[in-house]
């Protein structure tokens, strides 16, 4: 909740000047929606960036499904959204520590030796 940055699409990211604008728009967030383009996540390590990307992409899919249904919907109150976001932030074991080992084990089963 209010932890995602936004950046307007500027065409192909060939201009080095866009790097500074991306950095400024990220503004300390770890997740960004690149309008009309895609998603961007950063983290202390690959596990954190991947976990954030997985959650953000899933959230976008849910929103698209809800909007595509054409049915009325309601959002939870702002204070409840903030409370839930803070609970997730304060969770004793970060997602990257819960999910990453299992994801690596699954990848090793599907593609043995991928990490060599």
Regions found by a protein language model. Name each.
Residues 1-116:
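Glycine-rich flexible loops
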């Amino acid at each position: 909740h209010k932890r995602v940055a936004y950046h307007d699409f500027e065409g192909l990211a060939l201009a080095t000047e866009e790097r500074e604008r991306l950095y400024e728009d990220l503004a300390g967030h770890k997740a960004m929606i690149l309008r009309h383009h895609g998603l961007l996540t950063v983290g202390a390590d690959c596990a954190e960036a991947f976990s954030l990307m997985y959650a953000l992409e899933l959230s976008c899919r849910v929103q698209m499904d809800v909007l595509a249904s054409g049915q009325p919907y309601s959002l939870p109150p702002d204070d409840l959204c903030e409370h839930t976001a803070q609970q997730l932030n304060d969770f004793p074991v970060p997602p990257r520590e819960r999910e990453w080992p299992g994801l690596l084990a699954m990848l090793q089963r599907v593609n043995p030796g991928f990490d060599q």
